[in-house]
Curated annotation (Swiss-Prot):
Organism of this sequence: Escherichia coli O7:K1 (strain IAI39 / ExPEC)
Protein name: Hydroxylamine reductase
EC number: 1.7.99.1
Reaction equations catalysed: A + NH4(+) + H2O = hydroxylamine + AH2 + H(+)
Gene Ontology CC annotations of this record: cytoplasm
């Protein structure tokens, strides 16, 4: 086992990465190794997808499957080894079908890629795990060095984050052939184990630029189906009655659940990155979408154990449900998996609803505590002139984009301290689950404009980028000249690709934490600092002083 893709990876003087019987996320060595095997199979599939496009062959089954299966290897998504192997077998079957299509056009069609003809050696998981050793990401570290390995992983993990967003967009009916062609090209190239530093750096920026397009179509999918988010108050306390909790990012699953629970007497609560759903008109119209439950994903083993109803996980993040003994009432959807947990293959939630009706639910309603969400792209753009007016009248000094992933590391309290230290004449724009560090606190307003503005899920960084570009255009300056600072927390691969997106767009002087990614060497961090001004957090006082004086 070798996995260094998330923020909580093991770090020792000898090197970084989880390489024992189990990773810090709870992933076993078996599952981790089989995920490496799956990635190799997907690289072979992409190699043939690239070749097929040369013949004008576009296989939509391949295009929809490849990013979805890659998403299953993202942190805290799928811990179920047999399902990972199932994805690998499906990848190989799709590859062979695509290969046959190519050979039907050109009998001499071939692909020069080491993954292009990969076959699984056995049905036995142990044998497959031994085969997977051939594809361990750091297998040639001694030959290529830590810097090349780090850049490879930056590209691989960044592309994995983009694949997750591609799947979210695809679920909502969004497809862009140019994006899929670019995805396959990059995925196939990474399967050749590239070792050119400049080419890898260029690839990382290409991934960032591609992901900006992905976030654009995801935004289009969400807003076309569910309307543009508008500021909405959400209760974060319990309401009496039977209940279901839904977590993850998939708004379509939430919509289907709301439709199927309507009139059943079962209330629905959002958790984690589902919180922004309350801002969408077509979702909040359901009166039994009563509120948001819990805090950051890392607290779920305590909070889920206390929730008196079933739980549905639609995407990341799931962690071991046996610890809180709620594994008999947690359900997984789509690419999510945990051994022994019931999985919903389709969009029928009747079994979940039946379980909710058999459980006690919340016995009484707590005193409401309301927070505000729903500052989506359209709302943010509508406030652009107000922001400029406040800046011109010196009522608004600075905007801090304070967002990203949450996690268990104690140093993450930095983000709470930073938020509460932001001066009263400054505004906090937040997104993603890192907001749970401070989103239930009171921040007041500046002439009626809330000082805490929740822009949505992690992918809604797109809205923040569009706002920044709009402000820069209206002020006749560059984005880096705005009174705007980005202080980002990271945990997994979606955050990595958001960072690559920002860097590829030329955004500079981003501050990240709580630690640097374990796969980035001191040399690589120095390069990113020199090129983009990217740096790690220090202390709240020092960072605040520096950012306000920039």
């Amino acid at each position: 086992m070798f996995c260094v893709q998330c923020e909580q990876t093991i770090r020792t003087p000898a090197g970084n990465g989880c390489s024992y019987a189990q990773g810090m996320c709870g992933k076993t060595a078996e599952t981790s190794d089989l995920q490496d095997l799956l990635i190799a199979a997907l690289q072979g599939l992409s190699a043939w997808a690239v070749k097929a496009r040369e013949y004008g062959i576009i296989n939509h089954d391949v295009d929809s499957f490849a990013p979805r299966a890659f998403f299953s290897t993202l942190t805290n998504v799928n811990f179920d080894s047999p399902r990972i192997v199932g994805y690998a077998r499906e990848a190989i079957a799709l590859r062979e079908a695509l290969k046959a299509q190519c050979l039907a056009v050109d009998a001499n069609a071939r692909v020069d890629n080491p993954m292009a003809d990969l076959q699984l050696v056995s049905d036995d998981l142990g044998e497959l795990q031994r085969q997977a050793a051939e594809f361990t990401p750091n297998k040639d570290k001694a030959a290529i060095g830590e810097n090349i390995l780090g850049l490879r992983l930056l590209c691989l993990y960044g592309l994995k984050g983009a694949a997750a967003y591609m799947e979210h967009a695809h679920v909502l009916g969004q497809y862009d052939n140019d994006i899929y062609a670019q995805y396959h090209k990059i995925m196939a190239w990474l399967g050749t184990w590239p070792a050119d530093m400049n080419a890898l750096l260029e690839c990382s920026m290409e991934i960032g630029q591609m992901n900006f397009k992905v976030m654009s179509i995801l935004d289009a999918g969400e807003t076309s189906k569910y309307g543009h988010p508008t500021p909405t108050q959400v209760n974060v306390k319990a309401t009496a009655g039977k209940c279901i909790l839904i977590s993850g990012h998939d708004l379509k699953d939430l919509y289907n659940l709301l439709e199927q629970t309507e009139g059943t007497g079962v209330n629905v609560y959002t958790h984690g990155e589902m919180l922004p759903a309350h801002g969408y008109p077509e979702l909040r119209k359901f009166k039994h979408l009563v509120g948001n439950y819990g805090s950051g994903w890392q607290n779920q083993q305590v909070e889920f154990a206390r929730f008196p109803g079933p739980i549905v996980m639609t995407s990341n993040c799931i962690i071991d449900p046996t610890v809180g003994a709620y594994d008999d009432r947690i359900w997984t959807r789509s690419i999510v998996g945990w051994p022994g947990v019931r999985h919903l293959d389709g969009e029928d939630f009747s079994a979940v609803i039946a379980q909710a009706q058999q459980m006690a639910g919340f016995p009484y309603s707590e005193i409401p505590h309301l927070i505000t969400v729903g500052f989506g792209r359209q709302t943010l753009l509508g406030a652009a002139d107000t922001l400029i007016d406040l800046v011109s009248r010196e009522k608004l000094r600075h905007i801090f984009l304070l967002g990203g992933c949450d996690g268990a590391r104690g140093e993450r309290h930095y983000f709470t301290d930073f938020a509460t230290s932001v001066p009263d004449d400054c505004l906090i724009l937040t997104l993603a689950c890192g907001k749970y560090r401070f989103n239930k606190l009171e921040f007041g307003d500046i002439e009626g404009l809330p000082r805490l503005v929740d822009a949505g899920q992690c992918n809604d960084a797109y809205s923040a980028i569009i706002l920044a570009v709009t402000l820069a255009e209206k002020l006749g300056c560059g984005v880096n000249d705005l009174p705007l600072s980005l202080v980002l927390s990271w945990f997994e691969q979606k955050a990595i690709v958001i960072l690559l997106t920002l860097l590829s767009l030329g955004v500079k002087n981003i501050v990240t934490g709580p630690t640097a990614p374990g796969f980035l060497t001191p040399d690589l961090l120095a390069v990113l600092n020199e090129k983009f001004g990217l740096r790690s957090i220090t202390t709240v006082e020092e960072d605040m002083k520096q950012l306000l004086s920039a």
